[in-house]
């Protein structure tokens, strides 16, 4: 096989063979390969909207929301399966809670949503023929995934499904690693869920697998699973957590850019938990969230920010406050984020940067006063303005720096002020130019 020219089918096979990594390690330990020109073009077509979107909403919601003590409560508190199952009798959210999620996402400037259709606890939020342990056959009495899909579409948002391969509830969920008959039963159960999700809800934009413990790609029959997904949803994009490389990588709770043109998305919480945790008050500030979004956009990635609704589907007030603040900033400054390009300039004591074409956006987190300076910018500046108001900003450029002058002593915008800098070409920064070229006094 010529690994430099692989069809999608051969590519999936190779990834299945080479991607046996520990469940706790979400990286992909596979040899670098290149797709055929046709497969590259197909991936670019499918991912175009995603690269432009930059910002999405993650929703972790399930039976653990009833307990309100973290989404891993079943495992971390050693709850027996029969005891945990009783939570399904208390999980009866208010109708169409997802409408509030979607409206909040749109106000926050997010362009897509990803909801947990089944988390590690094994409870299915969708109607399935495989088990009675699902929302339509328990207290909720309805398909919660269907409500979510309809809500997202009503707000013009792209639809993503999270699905956990690991399952603490299914009898074969652990023994499948040692018992071939159990593996076959369990894999058929999982593949049936994926088929139902890809068949019953119209066009789906993202499939977001999670935790592939305890099997490898061969055990999960991941190649077969992905081929089914693409057959049923030819425009979908999939992540890398079923032990195949997929279309994009998923650094968790950190911002870590991929090398080359590999797509990536940082998923992060607003506090310390993915699911609703009533006692977790360690909330990130809107400023921190905005800085994270800027950092992701700067390095060519996406930012998937999580909320953990309560059992009734309502959103914690602090999440609403944070996302509303982020949305107010995005209303004025979203141009610097959406459809932005990887940005080489990155060094400043008080700012970070994004880029769109030849326009450099300096996001000033710590306002220095009436003058903002950027050292080592090697591209000639044509003009500058405050992005939120369009107000012209005066500047002076010499070989060492660009100084933007005549600004107010107090930051014009809260929590981050953005200066749009139009350059003659793609903006480039030499990080050691000043150190190397600045004239020094003779001793």
Q: Which residues does each PLM region occupy?
A:
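Cleavable N-terminal signal peptides
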Residues: 27-28
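Mature catalytic domains of secreted/periplasmic carbohydrate-active enzymes
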Residues: 12-22, 31-443
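N-terminal secretory signal peptides
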Residues: 1-10
């Amino acid at each position: 096989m010529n690994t430099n020219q692989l069809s999608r089918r051969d590519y999936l096979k190779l990834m299945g063979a080479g991607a046996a990594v520990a469940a706790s390690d979400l990286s992909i330990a596979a040899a670098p390969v290149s797709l055929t020109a046709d497969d590259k073009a197909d991936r670019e077509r499918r991912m175009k909207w995603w690269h432009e979107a930059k910002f999405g909403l993650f929703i972790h919601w399930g039976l653990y929301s009833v307990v309100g003590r973290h989404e891993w409560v079943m495992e971390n508190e050693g709850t027996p399966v029969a005891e945990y199952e009783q939570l399904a009798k208390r999980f009866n959210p208010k109708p169409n809670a997802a409408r509030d999620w979607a409206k909040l996402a749109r106000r926050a400037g997010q362009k897509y949503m990803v909801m947990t259709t089944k988390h590690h606890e094994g409870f299915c939020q969708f109607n399935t023929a495989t088990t009675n342990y699902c929302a339509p056959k328990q207290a909720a009495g309805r398909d919660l995934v269907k409500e979510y899909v309809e809500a997202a579409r009503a707000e013009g948002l792209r639809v993503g499904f999270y699905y956990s391969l690991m399952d603490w509830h299914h009898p074969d969920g652990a023994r499948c690693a040692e018992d071939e008959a159990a593996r076959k039963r369990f894999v058929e159960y999982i593949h049936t869920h994926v088929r139902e999700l890809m068949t019953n809800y119209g066009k789906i934009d993202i499939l977001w697998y999670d935790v592939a413990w305890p099997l490898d790609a061969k055990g999960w029959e991941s190649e077969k699973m992905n081929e089914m997904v693409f057959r049923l949803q030819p425009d979908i994009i999939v992540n890398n957590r079923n032990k195949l490389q997929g279309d994009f990588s998923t650094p968790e709770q950190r911002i870590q850019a991929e090398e080359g043109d590999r797509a990536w998305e940082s998923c992060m919480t607003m506090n310390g938990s993915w699911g609703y945790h009533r006692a977790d008050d360690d909330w990130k500030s809107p400023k921190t969230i905005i800085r994270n979004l800027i950092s992701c956009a700067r390095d060519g990635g996406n930012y998937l920010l999580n909320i953990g609704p309560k059992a009734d589907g309502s959103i914690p007030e602090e999440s609403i406050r944070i996302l509303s603040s982020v949305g107010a900033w995005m209303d004025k400054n979203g141009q610097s984020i959406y459809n932005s390009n990887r940005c080489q300039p990155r060094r400043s004591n008080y700012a970070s940067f994004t880029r769109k074409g030849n326009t450099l956006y300096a996001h000033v987190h710590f306002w220095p006063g009436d003058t903002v300076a950027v050292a080592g910018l090697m591209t000639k500046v044509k003009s500058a303005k405050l992005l939120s108001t369009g107000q012209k900003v005066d500047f002076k450029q010499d070989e060492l720096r660009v100084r933007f002058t005549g600004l107010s002593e107090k930051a014009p915008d809260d929590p981050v002020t953005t200066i749009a800098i139009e350059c003659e070409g793609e903006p480039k920064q030499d990080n050691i130019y000043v150190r190397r070229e600045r004239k020094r006094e003779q001793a």
